[in-house]
Amino acid sequence: MAKPKILIIVENLPVPFDKRVWKEASSLHQNGYDVTVLCPRGKGYEQGHEVIGGIHVYRHPMLKEANSGFGYLCEYGWALFWEFLYTCWIYLRRGFRVMQGCNPPDLVFLIALPFKLLGIKYIFDHHDASPELYFSKFGKKGVVYKIQVWLEKLTYRFSDVVMSTNGSYRDLALTRGGLDPEDVFIVRNGPDLRTFTPVPPNPALKHGKPYLIGYVGTMSIQEGLDILLDVALHIKNLGRRDIHFTCIGGGPELARLRKMTQDKDLEEMVNFTGRIPDKQLVEILSTADVCVNPDKPCEMNDISTMIKIMEYMALEKPIVQFDLKEGRFSAQGASLYADRRSQVTDFASKILWLIEHPAERKRMGNLGRRRVQEELAWEYSVDNLLAAYARVFTKWDWRSSRRRSTDPRATSHGRLDEARPST
């Protein structure tokens, strides 16, 4: 029997660099689906087409990441143009019965619309709350913000099933989107413990200091890296010269952050690696004594789950972060939570406290690792991923061939008691 064919479209990152999308594609392939992924090209991922582990990956041309309203208009328009052309070609060449669109932005449903007329079903994989994301970047609720709200509503309107990364995003789908609870599934973005596991620390990575503070994520002000630099400066002003900060990752403001580091005279205390291979990333974080998440307190960060938190936990690292709803849900006792009001000083004091209490660092690290192993690892998300696809295939209805009752995905995963969302 032919495998059910699906197409996954992601606009903002290449695959397999986008870890969530790659884990989804791999898990679906391993469970009997014929998977094709369409994504942009990026540094290190310039090949237009390749087959990786049985998964066809197509990459379209992409403009440089935008940082203005006009820039976003050009970037998204360019992406939609190529996505539509590639999708038409993939449909004619390989075929697909379900399309999965990953945001941001909330625009992939536009690619799905003409194919829905052919009976194709659409799954919305909700990575980021776009209205909140826009406001966190620009602090405005003008015309562009209202367009984001409108596009989100349309995305929900034309989605047959929604996959949310956490309970807060599921609530958005139920309240702002008005979806049936049976059509919304929580698929958390936990680390894959088969590949993301601690390695022995390498003292050479501590830059000659006794203690290393680790960070991984996107290099942008929105991620709170400016706060982290102020934290490092505060620690330096306290007379500490025994602590080094290593920040891992690429992003639109990497050059600006390096310049800020230079301006604050922190070059001997802070370094930015840029984007590096996962093996090197894991070695640095495994060497770190404390890992940090300086995401700024705001509505976007409050309702979002950051994969870095669970990666730190998987590597048995104690964490310092601000007290945010989903961050606390993920880390629980594996983290200390800095006061939102006294951002820099309290964040710094939490780091210093952990530095001075190695037994507590070990206890918190063990607690975090155990929580990931028992609840948050990617393996616990696969069941809901499969349930979401089982649900959408029960809705699939091809006008020339009524397959709803015979599709293997529907019969093996389609019962409501097996496909119900979990929290």
Give the predicted meaning of each segment.
Residues 223, 279-284, 293-313, 320-333:
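Nucleotide-sugar-dependent
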Residues 248, 255-282:
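Nucleotide-activated donor-binding/catalytic signature segment of Leloir-type glycosyltransferases, i.e.
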Residues 353, 360-375, 384-387:
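A short, well-ordered alpha-helix in the C-terminal region of glycosyltransferases
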Residues 7, 205-232, 246, 385:
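Conserved donor-binding/catalytic core segment of Leloir-type glycosyltransferases
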